[in-house]
Amino acid sequence: METNPFTLGFGKTPHTFISRTSEIQNVIEDFNSDLPASQSYLITGVRGSGKTVTMTAIANSLKEEGEWIIINLNPNRPLLETLVAKLYDQPDLQPLFIKAKFNLSLFGLGASFEKVAPVSDIEVALEKMLNQVKEIGKKVLVTIDEVTKSENIKIFTSSFQLLIREDLPIFLLMTGLYENIHELQNDSTLTFLYRASRINLEPLDMVSIKNRYKEIFKIPASKAKRMAELTNGYSFAFQTLGYLCWKNREFLEDETALLPAYDDYLQSYVYQKLWTELSPQDRKVLSILSDEKLTKVKELREQLGFSSSMMSVYRDRLKRKG
């Protein structure tokens, strides 16, 4: 039996996915320009919208060009120390650092050199290393997935700002849920991030979803269109629906049997997590919004006790949360 081209795993690039070509190309072109508009991009969206896949696609494309060194960092580890260690381990760079007699022994890297004082500050070490990278005409892209407002991130982004002010070839891609990115950008100590370019991942193009289903399942355009409508442009729903129909081809002919299984998977993988992350007030608002008897905005506002402006704020917040 052929391998299922769809996947339910988060973070890993699926065998089949709909690339966000425009967003990806814009970042690549900016990073490759002589005077980039931004050396940092924040990719945000609801859970399962394809943030990690988009970031990975950008990193892989740049890596293929040969001028880029890609460093993936874990947001829960000391970021500056890990970046220095990973740069030192790069086969193309380590000989340069040794030749330049960088004494990084205090960080557990390489050997100490006679009459060469060890570098004692991690930012100084990173600056020296990036200057070597600059001399050979290369650039460093740092990727960090699923960031939150943590001390690790605050320290790293503050240092990153200093490095780009020194005109060093370091670039940054970070992904995160809307509320986490919003919290980071509004931290008074991280004004640099407030000015960082942000990519908000919108729903996938419905025509692209339809065409992909039509191609993979060899089904009529009308049936593929109906499947696309069931996803509502949600990236994880595109994968889930495709996964189920590949696993059980009878679902392609029997929507009545498909829908309960489809809802169960979305509930287990996404909806339960989204619900637990909502505040009690958010849950109350959603419960009232789901009341089919309340069809007019005015009726909803009165039931919630919201002003027009408050209603708009909540609607926008909940939409961004998924």
Predicted regions and their residues:
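Conserved Walker B catalytic segment
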Residues: K115-E179, N186-D187
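A short, basic N-terminal segment
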Residues: M1-Y41, D89
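Conserved catalytic segments around the Walker B and adjacent sensor/switch elements
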Residues: S40-Y41, T56, N60-P78
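Short amphipathic alpha-helical interaction segments
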Residues: L304-K321
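Walker A/P-loop nucleotide-binding motif
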Residues: P36-A57
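Conserved small helical "lid"/interfacial subdomain of P-loop NTPases
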Residues: A196-A224, L230
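Winged-helix-like regulatory helical subdomains adjacent to P-loop NTPase cores
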Residues: Q239-S308
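Conserved NTP-binding/hydrolysis module of P-loop NTPases
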Residues: E67, P78-L109
